């Protein structure tokens, strides 16, 4: 792992479609390993990606025929790509900040212990001013 720099990266994951979650988490991990201070925010339906049970139900390409979904998942498995659970653990262990939207937590009636390890609730009073605005890049998935 590269030593962290002063560059900050803000990643927002707003969808619960597996490919988008995967791309957001892989981007976050790549930036973290390149030395950026990474914060990943899970809002809207993206909050499902950090729920202990719902993360297991994420679908790849849900708008495509089932055979296409199966082919893509098989290719990902053949490439030995990590699943979101593994990526979240890597990000947490490597020092990224993982935040869930407190509004969506209430809307979807999640309990505090529903989240995977390492996820905290974002502070609405400071999230944008302390995380988003100072970031060198803000990416949304």
What are these regions (language model features)?
Residues 8, 132-136:
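Polar low-complexity intrinsically disordered regions
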Residues 10-21:
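Short, glycine-rich nucleotide/cofactor-binding loops
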Residues 21-35, 40:
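Histidine-anchored nucleotide/phosphate-binding helix
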Residues 38-44, 99-102:
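Short internal beta-strands
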Residues 46-59:
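N-terminal beta-loop-helix "entrance" segment that forms/cooperates
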Residues 56-60, 116-119:
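Short, hinge-like loop/turn segments at secondary-structure boundaries
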Residues 59-93:
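A glycine-rich helix N-cap at a beta->alpha junction
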Residues 84-128, 136:
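A charged, amphipathic interaction segment
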């Amino acid at each position: 792992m590269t030593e962290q720099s002063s560059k900050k990266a803000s990643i927002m994951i707003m969808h619960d479609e597996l490919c988008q979650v995967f791309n957001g988490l892989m981007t976050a991990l790549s930036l973290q390993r390149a030395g950026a201070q990474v914060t990943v925010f899970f809002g809207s339906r993206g909050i499902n990606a950090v729920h202990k049970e719902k993360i297991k139900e994420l679908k790849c390409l849900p708008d495509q025929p089932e055979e296409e979904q199966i082919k893509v998942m098989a290719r990902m498995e053949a490439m030995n790509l990590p699943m979101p659970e593994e990526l979240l653990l890597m990000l947490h262990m490597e020092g990224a900040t993982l935040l869930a939207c407190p509004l969506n937590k209430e809307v979807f009636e999640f309990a505090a212990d529903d989240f995977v390890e390492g996820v905290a609730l974002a502070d609405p009073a400071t999230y944008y001013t302390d995380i988003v605005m100072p970031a060198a890049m803000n990416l949304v998935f």
